[in-house]
């Protein structure tokens, strides 16, 4: 009588490593780092966890460097607008086996300069030495708009900060002269491109007659 024994060899019966999810904000045109392994659970505390690779769903916008030590560097291209992306990182413990490999996720928010505002045509009666402007905000691209700036040219040039509202009165202009106006938006990343241009001509309306009989 012969008997057979089946033996299954496993790398370890210890729990798998556990990697906490990370979040990261990156400005367009810049880079940020995050230590993926800083607070990870390591079933073999006498050995280090090792990053073996990573993938990103934003390959056209992000450049990701995933060294073995887990300090992941993420660079965002310039002028790409706002986006939300994920990087999936593969991590192994001291056994260095595929069956014990785990993944960590880095959620990335890319922030960019605002889109250009849309300046509305000037409407209403002419104003004495002034022009009233209004515009529609473009996308803030992940960072709140903090300021609008109007610039003008024509019979002289200038600029005016209009705060964070979407309307502004430009004063000190010469009546009967035509000016061209543009507006830009600013957030913590920088200034948007200039808006479309509109023209306006300040003028003083004639006084109403007082001796009409």
Listing of model-derived features with the role each one plays in the protein:
Residues 74-77, 123, 135, 162, ...:
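Hydrophobic core positions of the immunoglobulin-like beta-sandwich fold
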Residues 147-174, 194:
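Recognizes extended acidic, P/S/T-rich segments that occur
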Residues 27-35, 69, 125-134, 175:
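Short coil/turn motif common to extracellular beta-sandwich-like domains
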Residues 1, 68-86, 93, 108-110, ...:
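Extracellular/luminal low-complexity segments enriched in Ser/Thr/Pro
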Residues 36, 117, 121, 133-136, ...:
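An aromatic-rich alpha-helical recognition segment common to small helix-rich domains
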Residues 34, 40-71, 102-111, 121-123, ...:
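Surface-exposed or secretory-pathway low-complexity segments enriched in glycine-proline
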Residues 81-96, 170-192:
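Beta-strand-rich modules
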Residues 2-45, 90-120, 134, 196, ...:
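Extracellular interdomain linkers/hinges and stalk-like, low-complexity segments
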């Amino acid at each position: 009588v012969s008997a057979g024994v089946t033996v299954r060899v496993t790398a370890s019966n210890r729990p798998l490593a556990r990697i906490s999810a990370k979040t990261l904000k990156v400005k367009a045109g810049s880079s940020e780092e995050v230590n993926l392994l800083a607070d990870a659970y390591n079933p073999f505390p006498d050995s280090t966890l090792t990053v073996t690779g990573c993938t990103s769903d934003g390959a056209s916008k992000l450049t990701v460097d995933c060294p073995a030590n887990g300090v992941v560097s993420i660079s965002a291209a310039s002028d790409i607008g706002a986006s939300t992306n994920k990087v999936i990182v593969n991590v192994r413990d001291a056994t260095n086996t595929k069956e014990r490999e785990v993944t960590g996720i880095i959620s990335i928010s890319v922030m960019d300069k605002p889109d250009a505002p849309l300046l509305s045509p000037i409407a209403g009666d002419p104003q004495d030495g002034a022009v009233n402007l209004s515009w529609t905000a473009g996308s803030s691209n992940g960072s709140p708009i903090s300021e609008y700036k109007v610039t003008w040219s024509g019979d002289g040039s200038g600029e005016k900060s209009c705060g964070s509202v979407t309307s502004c009165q430009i004063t000190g202009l010469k009546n009967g002269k035509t000016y061209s106006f543009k507006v830009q938006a600013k957030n913590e990343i920088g200034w948007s491109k200039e808006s479309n241009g509109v023209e306006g001509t300040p003028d003083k309306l004639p006084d109403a007659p007082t001796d009409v009989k």
